Amino acid sequence: MKQESASQSTPPPSLSPAPSSAQPSWGDGDPQALWIFGYGSLVWKPDFAYSDSRVGFVRGYSRRFWQGDTFHRGSDKMPGRVVTLLEDREGCTWGVAYQVRGEQVNEALKYLNVREAVLGGYDTKEVTFYPQDTPDQPLTALAYVATPQNPGYLGPAPEEVIATQILACRGFSGHNLEYLLRLADFMQLCGPQAQDEHLEAIVDAVGTLLPCSYLPEQPLALT
């Protein structure tokens, strides 16, 4: 059985961190703009209007399937497993940052408050986001993070146990397995520099448990 490690998501070796003189900015200098970092379902299903989006990563965090979900990908009787961010000095988590401007800001935050906070149990946190194409120009972004203090938090478990739980759960947004595989699909599209050993181990465990392949109805594509 694979031992859990907080630093399984390795930083991309080909991308160096921003020099100390580079200060993250909130909306490319626009005081009415905001970046929102998604690392779970937001990477393929933001469902809010935005002006720009960039693929990239945040340092100092690892992604873990440690948050329980009783609405989107599970139920009260059978909570699904969705991701949160774990503070990890050596960690690196890939995702998508969306820029919202003007009226989009309030609309996006109102929508995400229900989707992520009320229904998901997530709190907001400020993170530094490094765009894949311009890692020397970091951005300050808002991320939704589930902490151990929220009632839906499930915490660590062996990847095989997490995989079994994911295979059994479904919520109002669909099957928990779809969530897992779409996230894995996104990571493959990011390229070989994007690694997440925790995610990969769960996908491998699902492949062992599942007798046939499961494919999402609509393939994911980065635009």
Swiss-Prot record:
GO CC list: cytosol; trans-Golgi network
InterPro entries: ChaC, GGCT-like, GGCT-like_sf
Compartment(s) of residence: Cytoplasm, Cytosol; Golgi apparatus, trans-Golgi network
Keywords: Apoptosis, Cytoplasm, Golgi apparatus, Lyase, Neurogenesis, Notch signaling pathway, Unfolded protein response
CDD domains in the cross-refs: GGCT_like
Disordered: annotated span: 1-26
Recorded catalytic activity of this chain's protein: glutathione = L-cysteinylglycine + 5-oxo-L-proline
Catalytic residues, chain numbering: 116 (proton acceptor)
NAD keyword on record: no
Binding site for substrate: 36-41
Chief place of localization: cytoplasm
Entry's Gene Ontology BP terms: glutathione catabolic process; intrinsic apoptotic signaling pathway in response to endoplasmic reticulum stress; negative regulation of Notch signaling pathway; negative regulation of protein processing; neurogenesis; Notch signaling pathway; response to caloric restriction; response to unfolded protein
EC number: 4.3.2.7
Tissue: Widely expressed, with high expression in forebrain and anterior spinal cord. Expressed at intermediate level in the dorsal aorta and heart. Present throughout adult brain (at protein level).
Single GO term (MF): glutathione specific gamma-glutamylcyclotransferase activity
Description of how the protein assembles with itself and partners: Interacts with NOTCH1 (via extracellular region).
Role, per record: Catalyzes the cleavage of glutathione into 5-oxo-L-proline and a Cys-Gly dipeptide. Acts specifically on glutathione, but not on other gamma-glutamyl peptides. Glutathione depletion is an important factor for apoptosis initiation and execution. Acts as a pro-apoptotic component of the unfolded protein response pathway by mediating the pro-apoptotic effects of the ATF4-ATF3-DDIT3/CHOP cascade.
Family indicated by similarity: Belongs to the gamma-glutamylcyclotransferase family. ChaC subfamily.
UniProt name for this protein: Glutathione-specific gamma-glutamylcyclotransferase 1
Naturally occurring in which organism (per UniProt): Mus musculus (Mouse)
